[in-house]
Amino acid sequence: MSSLQATNTGSAHATSAWMRWLTHRWSVQALALLGVLMVLPVINSGLTLDDFLHWSTLHEGARVANHTGSPWGLFHFLAGNVADNQALKATGEMVWWAANDLRTLFWRPLTEWTHWLDHGLWPQSPALMHLHSLLWYGALILLLARLYQRLDTGSQVRARLAVLIFICSSLHLSAVAWIAARNQLVAACCAVLCIGAFHVWRTRPSPRHGWLAVAMFGLALMSAEAGLATLGYLVAHALVFGAPHQPHQASSVWRERVAPLLPFLLIMVIWRVAYNALGYGSSGSGFYIDPASDPVRFAGNIMLRLPTLLLAQVFGVPSATLNLLAPAQQALYATAAAVALALCWWVARIYGVWASPVARFLGIGGVLALVPMCASETTDRLLLNAEIGFSWLLAMLFARALGQHRPRRSWDTLPAKILIGLIVFVHLVVMPIQTVAYAALRKPLLTPTSVLDPLELPDGRQDPDARLVLLNPPLAALTFYYPSVRRYHGMVNPASMHALANSFHDLSLTVVDAHTLELRSAGNKSFIDAFSRDVVTRPFKIGEAIQAGPIQAVVATLSPHGTPRSVRFRFSSPITSSPWRFYVWTDAGYVPYTLPAPGQTTSLPAPDLSRALMRQLKGEERRQAQSSE
C-alpha cells in the first residue's frame, strides 16, 4: 500500500512540475524555440525536387508553363497543353504514360514573393532558405499559442499543452523541412490570424477584427490552396457560437450564423472564379481530383480519405498507407479507421470533452478543414491545418485524464484510459522521436534519389547527342526534375533521359528485335505511378500506342486495375546504335546495362530498398567524416 502511495505521490509531483513549467511566463517562447530546435537539422538538407525548379525559373529564366496572374510562375508545372507535354515526353522530362493533357498549375502569389526574397538575398545558401521557413514555423507556433489562450481563457496549462503537442507532431514535418512546401506554413499563419480575428469579432463588437479576418482569409488563399481549410473553422465557429455578444437579442439563425460568413464565402467564390479563369488547377492526374468538375468522385474519396487522414491525426498511422492498398482493401481500411475514430469520440464523450463549446468548435473545424484535402492523395503534409484544432482537443483530453476527471460510468475507466495512454504515447513519445530523427536524416534519406541519382548519369559534354534510357528508376516521375538538378550542379544534359518503368516490382526484359524491347511486371502488378495519369478518366487500352519522341510505347497487357502490366517499346533507330545508353537502378544507384541478344529475356529484380537505404546512410556518414577532416 505504501509503495502505491509513493508511486501516486511521485506521479503527482511530476505532473505538478509540468504544470508549473507550462504556466511560466516564458513557456510560450520556450515552446516556440524548442519546436524550431527539434527540426533545426533540416537547414543542412539542401534543395529538393520543386526547389530546383524554383532556382531554374528565378536564375535561368526557365518557364515550365505560362504564369498569367502570378509573379514568376513558381508553382506552374504543366499547363495541360498537348504540344508542350509532347515536347517534354520527347526529352524524357515527362514519363511516356503521362496524360497528354496533364495539367498542374497552382496559384500561390504571396508565397512566391517569399521564394523571390530567398533567391534575391541568399541565392547560393539553401541553409538560409531553410532558416527562412523555420522563422515562419516559429511564427506559426507563437500565433497558435495566442489563439489557444484567446479561445481557452479558463486554462493556461491546457492551451500551452496544446502547443507542446503541436511542436511534437511529426505530421507536418515535411511542410517545415521542404522549402517548396513553405506555402503551407504561410497559409497556416494567415489561417490562425483569421480564426483568432473572427473569434474576437463574433464574441465582442469589434469591426476592426472583422476586417482583419477577411483580409487574412484572402491572404491565406493567395498563399496556398490549403488556405481554403480556414473556412472550415469559420463555419464551425458559426455553428457552435453563433453570435455570443448578442445573447439576449432575438436574432434569426440567418443573422447569427450565416450572415457573418457571407464576406468569406464571397471571397472564396471570387478566388475560385479567378483561379479557373486564369487556367489554374489540376487535371489528368490520378493524384488530384477537381471537386468542381467531378463532385461524385470527390464525395467517394471523402468517404475513403477523411477517416484515413483523421486516423493519422489521432494515432499517427501514416496516411499514405491508403495509397498502397487495392481499392477493395482501401474500403476496409477506411472502415476500420472510422471504427477507431468512433472509439476516440466515445472516450472524449465519457470524459466530458464535448461539453466544452471550444472543443466542439475546434473538433468540427478540424474535420471540415480536411474535406478539401480529400481532393489529393493522402499524405501527412495535408494535416497541418487540421492540427490547429486537434492539438487543442488532444490537450483537453490529456488534461482531463491527468486531472483525475471521473468518467460518467466507472466501468468505462480502464478501456478509456488505455486508449488515452496509447494516444499520449504516440503524440508525446513516438512523434517527437520521429520528428528529431527525420530532421537529422532527411538529407541522407532524400538526397540519393532526388539529387545523387541524376548526377550519376553521364555529363552531356561527353556526348551531347546521347539518349539515356532508364529501365527501372525508383520513381520514374522524378525525371521531371533531373535536368534542373543537373544544371544546378553545373552539368550539361544529354539529348534526352527516358524512364521506362518504376522499380516497384520485379521486371522481365525481352529484346524482341533490333528496334524493340518489352518490359513486363511480375504477377498482375503495374509499373507506373498514379500521379501522371488518371486511369479512371483516361483509361489505358490494349494496343494503345504512345509516342515519346524517338520512342513509341505500345501497351501489350493490362493489370486488373487497368494499368499497363507489359509494354513494348519501339526505338526510332537500332537499340545497339550509338545514341542509346541503357541504365538500370540497383541498390548502389544507376549502373550501365548491356541488353541481351534479340529473342532473349532477362530479369530486372526490384532493388532491396532497405539495403539501399543503409548504404546511403553509411555513405552519408563517410562523406560527413571526410568533410570534417
Regions found by a protein language model. Give the residues of each.
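Intrinsically disordered, polar/acidic, low-complexity terminal segments
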Residues: 52-58, 71, 77-78, 98, ...
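Polytopic membrane enzymes that build or remodel cell-surface glycoconjugates and lipids
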Residues: 2-486, 551
